């Protein structure tokens, strides 16, 4: 985020909105390409009963090949990259607006507002991504209900993320792209609030204790990504279940979601790996670009 650390020997560069946006754009694109296969495995574990990360990975590779783990990358990459760029820019602006507030509360409020704003635009992209990622599994489920053979799976090739969005609109209507939005909103608002607060606090304390800035960025990014994800993971699982069931024409009452069951955390292992990796990479690159102003030249 390139936020200033007051009264410390190391000075972070806050920069202009344009420099914030461009630095976040490039760093987010790189980190999301690196972490996408882990996200694909996470979604499969959340929506179908794979007992381990290994079994989920083996199933995906066996049925779809390694490229299957990158299926649906285009649309969420655009979404994640743009939303991260906008969110960092919005966050910096909100932080200035609440400059008179206690630092920790300022980080939390600014993150909360950022997540709320971004969720409105990110939901259709994420829903299309989920649709694309579990398309093969959905067809197996539907064919099993109709007692059809798996050989018919080869009739239609897997959908891309753009094809998924088009298919959702064609079959369910334009507003269907926001199915499960209340869960998405809750996840993004609370997640962003925790995310930015944890990152800012840890980064500031590490640098204050003479930790090298780049290590502070990497560690704080990994830690904020993992911890904030643990806090909102049940909501993310509920979102995936609701969206999957909508595609299967199954109603999902709030009481039917296993909030107090360990199954709500299915896929948490791969999610923590992904979140730590992506955010460590993202914040390190972001802060580096902001400090060197390499993208402004």
Curated annotation (Swiss-Prot):
Q: What is its main location?
A: mitochondrion
Q: Name one GO molecular function term.
A: transmembrane transporter activity
Q: Mark the transmembrane ranges.
A: 18-38, 72-91, 107-127, 184-204, 215-235, 264-285
Instruction: List the record's Gene Ontology CC terms alphabetically.
Output: mitochondrial inner membrane; mitochondrion
Under InterPro entries, the record lists:
Mitochondrial_Carrier, Mitochondrial_sb/sol_carrier, Mt_carrier_dom_sf
Q: Per the record's keyword annotation, is Membrane included, yes or no?
A: yes
Q: Where does the protein end up?
A: Mitochondrion inner membrane
| The entry's keywords | Membrane, Mitochondrion, Mitochondrion inner membrane, Repeat, Transmembrane, Transmembrane helix, Transport
Each Solcar repeat, start to end: 15-97, 102-205, 212-292
SUPFAM superfamilies for the chain? Mitochondrial carrier
Give me any GO biological process, just one: mitochondrial L-ornithine transmembrane transport
Q: How does it sit in the membrane?
A: Multi-pass membrane protein
Q: What is the protein's known function?
A: Required for arginine biosynthesis. Transports ornithine synthesized from glutamate in the mitochondrial matrix to the cytosol, where it is converted to arginine.
PANTHER family reported for this sequence = CARRIER PROTEIN, PUTATIVE (AFU_ORTHOLOGUE AFUA_4G06390)-RELATED, MITOCHONDRIAL BASIC AMINO ACIDS TRANSPORTER-RELATED
Q: Which family does it belong to?
A: Belongs to the mitochondrial carrier (TC 2.A.29) family.
Q: What is this protein called?
A: Mitochondrial ornithine transporter 1
Organism of origin is: Schizosaccharomyces pombe (strain 972 / ATCC 24843)
**Lineage of the native species?**
Eukaryota, Fungi, Dikarya, Ascomycota, Taphrinomycotina
